[in-house]
Amino acid sequence: MNLKSTGKLTLAANPLFALLLIMLLLCPHEALAAGNIEYLQPKPLYDCDTLKGVHLKPVKGGVLKIPLITWPGDVATIYTDQLGLFKKEGLDVQLFLENDFAKQVKAVLEGETPLLRGTMGMVNAAAETFAKQGTELVVLYQLTWSTGGDCLVVRPGVKSLTDLKGKNVALQLYGPHMDYLTTVLKKAGLRPTDVHARWLKELSVPAYDTHGKIVDPRSAFEAAADLDGAMVISPDANALTSGGTGTGAEGSVRGARVLFSSKSANRVISDVYAVRADYFKANRARVERFVHALMLGQEQFSKLLANKSSDQGAYKKLVSRSAELLFGSPQAVADVEGSLGGDCEWVGYSGNVSFFTGAGTTRTFAKLKDEIQSSFLELGLLKSKAPLQTAGWDYKAMAAGLANSKVAVAPKQAFDPTKAQRQVEKEIASGVGKWEKEGSLYSFEIYFAPRQAGFTAAQYSDAFKKALELSQTLGGTLITIEGHNSPDALNKAKADGKSDTQIALIEQAAKNLSYQRAIAVRQAYLDFCKQAGVPVDESQFLAVGMGTSSPKFPVPKTEEQWNANRRVVFRVKSVETELDSFKPSGK
């Protein structure tokens, strides 16, 4: 038989083909898929293909085009339009969806719209691009904080944030997770470059045909075993982890879990509107009316969400319109409603005043701008720091027509102190080593002298500032304040052959004393926060007496080691997976 003429092959006739076939059969599916991942090189936004050859043009007159992205925060903007509040402010507007941030930047540069919609991280990444074109960006309005919609999924070997050092993490380039990752790494004492960021084009699995290429973090994490983590949106996190711990079935990754989400780091991802500075200068009153309409609309939107059962007509109309604008189909109501269940917090008037003026918070525009741009310089996402302004609104005037214009209201109680104390004691009893490692995002220590009972802000101001910054950034975490005693008396009792009863009494006395010290430190810290003018959720801070259960040096040999055992540890704990054991009933 003439094999060539028939177009058929046999293994015997083609040894090379046979070898290739055997290699393919032996090669795991994951390895084959991993080879299709299309990673990108980090570079400033102005260097991306979309913006090559783009130049600044005057903003077109007429209709004000308002960009949206597929995020629950933008549902409030849609409701503002539905209520006719933009028209009442004398604005003729057109809402449009653009999830490709580079395309948004292109539209603003070319004058299609003066408005840019993104997170603070994305807007800071764009600031250098506008500076190179001879203008700047002005941040006008904060829509939301992400409070659950963004997650870090990890493989079983990663137990804490510090375990990420030297590891590979997938995330979208120019997307909302750039500063999310760098901020939480810094809070854990790591530098942005301590983690190997693997950049991808898309935020989530794209709807278009990628021709076999993997271009998003979820798909990359599923395909590549060398990825230790992935920054993903909550639906992708649920898929990868099977809603808890990945089983390896139905697109999940065996053993994968959410290390933390923006439910814990709930003051990191800030969604905002910005405007071209040249347009703002020429049209300040018009832009102010735009922001005022957003504030009025957000207040009405919050009222609708609270009373949707009694106003189903308006609610269904909003959800249908949002589904059409944000998901491309008025039938996608489940996607809209699913996103309204806790992915974000709409900040409203009070939140805008706090964010832009610093009233009652450390998580301000200026703070985020500085930490984001510093991190982006390290990662090569910026070549130099870029100007980014605020509008400098008169917020008293902006409050006109609002039902609620209070600022710096004390935060809601997130945890039930009794339930939290009981759960923490239970977890410590199951193993101190496990308690100190699993779920611990970060910890730091202060030290005290023998028989010291009092603790003041003057003594520990640096530590208290650090604790305040951590609690403000990671507002969904529990921060335990753990008292630790030196084991000297216990060691002596054991050496002297004391009875088990006597040893138990010494251990209990040490635990009681360490608890009293933890309480004293907690109170001194809360007093410090009051003096700083920053309202805090006191339930976030839990005093714990560790006694002699976890000495740094079980048998200290030097005075330095002896002193190091007398300490109070501030420990930031993620409690997302067991939240019912900590939160007040009905919340």
Cite the ranges covered by each PLM segment.
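Bacterial N-terminal signal peptides
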Residues: 14-28
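Short, glycine-/small- and polar/acidic-enriched structural segments
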Residues: 34-213, 217-234, 255-261
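Pocket-lining segment of extracytoplasmic ligand-binding domains
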Residues: 120-122, 130-131, 200, 204-326
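Secondary-structure end/capping motifs
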Residues: 281-384
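Periplasmic peptidoglycan-binding/tethering modules of Gram-negative envelope proteins
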Residues: 400-480, 488-501, 573-587
